[in-house]
């Protein structure tokens, strides 16, 4: 997968994740010895091109949020590399890492807990500017007010506290905070999952407008396929710490090549009650990442699995069609 092509659009690669691994130790006993490892993210690789949005989708617990946080080193990786403009972020320390982080920001999932309740939102938005030593106090205030205006808030809102805002407004504040440093790359970690449907579209459209204006690159993490389809250029599907499919938005939604992706697609509600779609019902529950299945991690729930092969050999991401990567031994059977 590390040889993933750059694509026909000619845009250069901004982010290149290679073999990313994040395992969490499980400790037990009086001496808190390590008894096992939760394989939250297990050898995933992908690229994100300059100016595009890559959607990262999967069920809760599949590792998508951990992948995003590890990329920014909010949690330290177990192994792998993350190249940003050709520089390995995982190899940076001290001032070099701090300088790199100015170009990489995150919008958190929960707009209620991601803001300090004791801090006026103007201070929250300008805090990153102060940490990175951007300008003087007057210049930082101008950038802060401009960032608030960009997300649809007014200058008088800067003195108010988070509890005085609605959920949608708080998420806009989170976006303004990420935008203030004028980064090149933003990870949006389920930014609309805690919002009403009527507010979700407003926030999504805001993200798209800001991307066009500031030439931003997004990693958009979500579990809602309809949301991912609305905003993404390409989509990666995760299952139990692995990427099982990666393709353009149009290709993935028209021709899903992995049985897990097909099951997710079949669960999307149709807007017309007179239309029906054949549901793909998966058997059993998602296995534990503490003890994942051998071979293909999806094989215990897969409707086309051949036990002797799928349980013994782990499939690798391979190019099923141009720019369409699938991790399945029998993906051709679904064509």
Regions found by a protein language model. Give the residues of each.
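A short, proline-enriched helix->beta-strand linker immediately N-terminal to the Walker B motif
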Residues: 180-184
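ABC ATPase NBD coupling module
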Residues: 30-35, 89-105, 131, 137-138, ...
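Conserved ABC ATPase "signature" region
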Residues: 87-88, 138-156, 185, 262-266
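Conserved ABC ATPase signature
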Residues: 161-165, 169
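Conserved ABC transporter NBD signature motif
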Residues: 80-88
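Short catalytic/signature loops enriched in Gly
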Residues: 4-13, 26-32, 37, 246-335
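P-loop NTP-binding/switch modules centered on Walker-like glycine-rich loops
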Residues: 187, 191, 195, 199-277
